[in-house]
Amino acid sequence: MEKKAFFQQLDERTDIRYTDSGLKIFRLKFPRAHLRLCNVKIDFGSRDVCIRAESGDTLLPYGTAHFLEHLLFWHNGRNLYSDFFAHGALLNAFTTYTDTNFMFTSLPDRLRQTIPILLDALWNHSFDKKIVAQEKAVITSEIQTAHLNHQLSYHYQLISMLSPSSPAAVFPAGRIEDIEALDISDLQKAYKAAYQAHRMTLFLIGGSENTETLLPPHLQLEKRPDYHAERKIIPACPPVLSQKMMLGDEERMEDTWTGLQIGALPGQNDLLSIKLYWDIAARILFQLDSPFFQEIQQTYRLEIDRLSAETYIYEDGGFLILHSQGTHSSAYIDVASYYVTQKKEQVAAWLQYGKDSLTDAIIYDSDYVRKCFEWAAECDRCDCSFLDMYHIIQDMDAQVFLSLIDAMASSNKAIIHVSQKEAIRQ
């Protein structure tokens, strides 16, 4: 099947409805899937540390969204995991920077029993002081364990060096002092503001059944109401700092972590476009098996044994975290930027590799309902279709790629050099 036709087919299999309470239903059919994936996404994540109301703003401790996620596993004195397991379903939950998710997989004939249980728990929570105290201990332990994960620690340390006041610099579970400061009043205010039907999307992925047959009958569905979505944009990067931020021994730089601030490009501030452009660029620049890396390694005899990159791009800014190992690890960004400027005639070929890599990944991921959910959630978050994604990917041109290279070379950077001894211990 032609790639464009595949993305069109994804859209044809997508059915978006709303309940009368405002709950959004995102149905994506996949005939080959044996199980059905259900995910309720709440528009409340680790970045949400302020509740705005007519009576005034309420500041929340970091980690509030994640703490609520833990609490909502307890309903009427019972643990939801056990209730779902009794129905042959495995319930999980996770909090990201932008939202909170409750996810489970199930046989199709069990959804009419499990979905009402989950929605009842999310909409009708009763706060219990004993459970709050219990979860404070659990989450404190979780934070302490996360600090032992050096790679995770470097991620947040780099973002903190670049933007110390950003919520993105704080682990989603918060800090120990935040957990100690949380009280039931904070949690109740956050719950009341966030866990509203109009702030939720229920994803149903897999199978070929009509949406109505999978949902409990009391949920009356309507088509999407007429409205104009607000385009999500990303701001420009802050001014470049005069001083480079660095930790560790620059003389022993075989293991290097680099953080970069990224933002809007000249003439382009659309959030989804910037996300996809950086995804393509990362596949070109930071994958050991990419033609670009093979060329640059042979040309300059670079000794780099490991190379990986992750991007975090949101409406309030973006970061790229690069991890490289090898004798020339700390020089890679500068060398790569220079090589692109010297070989501009090859940009089209590199771009085609990056575009093919991303579109193939989406097509491959679609065979797995968990991965397919992530792309569906991106469509929902940016209010776009799968075909819109495809067109953004294909329309990326050489000038955009060169703008990314310029941004990468000139952006604020934070660097952590890890000693060889410490890297081996990890």
UniProtKB/Swiss-Prot annotation:
- UniProt keywords, alphabetically: Antibiotic biosynthesis, Bacteriocin biosynthesis, Hydrolase, Metal-binding, Metalloprotease, Protease, Zinc
Indicate the residues that form the catalytic site: 69
EC number per UniProt: 3.4.24.-
Q: Which InterPro entries match?
A: Metalloenz_LuxS/M16 (IPR011249), MPP/UQCRC_Complex (IPR050361), Pept_M16_N (IPR011765)
Q: Which Pfam families match?
A: Peptidase_M16
Q: Where does Zn(2+) bind?
A: 66, 70, 142
The protein's required cofactor(s) are namely: Zn(2+)
Cite the SUPFAM superfamilies for this sequence: LuxS/MPP-like metallohydrolase (SSF63411)
* Segments traversing the membrane: none
The free-text note explaining how the cofactor binds reads: Divalent metal cations. Binds Zn(2+).
Q: Mind telling me which Gene3D superfamilies this protein's record contains?
A: Metalloenzyme, LuxS/M16 peptidase-like (3.30.830.10)
Write one Gene Ontology MF term.
Answer: metal ion binding
Q: A biological process (GO) annotation for this entry?
A: proteolysis
Q: What induces it?
A: Transcription is highly induced by oxygen limitation and is under dual and independent control of Spo0A-AbrB and ResDE.
Q: Which PANTHER family match?
A: METALLOPROTEASE, MITOCHONDRIAL-PROCESSING PEPTIDASE SUBUNIT ALPHA
Q: Which family does it belong to?
A: Belongs to the peptidase M16 family.
Function, in words? Required for production of the bacteriocin subtilosin. Could catalyze some step in the processing of presubtilosin.
Q: What is this protein called?
A: Putative zinc protease AlbF
